[in-house]
Amino acid sequence: PYITTNTLTRDCDTGIQNMGVYRTMVRNETSVVCNLTPGRQGYRNTLTWTNKDKVAPIAWAIAAPPAVHLATVAQLPYGVDEITLAGGMMGEAVNVVKCRTVDLLVPADAEIIIEGEIHPGETEMEGPFGEFAGFMGPVERRPVVRITAITHRRNPIYYGYTSQMPPSESTTIQSLTNAGIMLKMLRHDLGEIAVSDVFIDLTFAGMLGHAVIAMKPGYPGHSKKVGRLVAAMSPIKRVTVVDEDIDIRDHTHVEWAMNSRYNPSRDTVLIDDAYFPINMDPSVRS
């Protein structure tokens, strides 16, 4: 059995928390193995403890408010707490409470909270698991978590993300959340007001997926600049930039634009040696 919902960790140096989805294999009644993948924020947070020979705190919030689940899959800059994003979506702060046995804040309205500790050097093989990309995730050595507490409501509701051959629940919420974040970053943070819309396909979604950007270029090469920005800000594998008259959610319309306006030799930009911090894509593993 697996836990497939919100995982919370904390940076030992800054105190900033991270919330993400890291599949977690139930090992026995008192321990699990968490797929904290190198390069992702939960993994980095854990290292800030274990590299100092300290025990790292970790927790799972099962069946939290919907905005919390949406924020969990967001590809946010390192150091930004996803619970803050969830509060923005809700229009009010997320109620949080301190865990009983570890130093973490978790959503108070979650149905179930599982608390645990990661001790330096304790690892075990984890996997395989049917992942959001439609492939079996690989078996690799990952941290063992000693469970320290489980709290829950009376008659709690259990919830987990459904990952299967895409599109799935998992890829759909990744697409919605990360497209919105990408549009906000382009228009408001980077000043690219020529960008009018962003869509991320429902196959690999926010992780290694295909982003389609609609914009009105202001000068020659403007669309290539925006494409590079998108490639740099997230683990997106492909970026297609089209004019704003194209319905980017209509695959046929996008293909029409590609066939009628795209010149491969002139309009293709390849970025060599790009690193994607995820091992669910067979082309990355090969």
Question: Locations of the language-model features?
Answer:
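Internal mixed beta-strand/loop scaffold within catalytic domains of large alpha/beta enzymes
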Residues: 1-61
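Charged, compositionally biased interaction regions
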Residues: 65-286
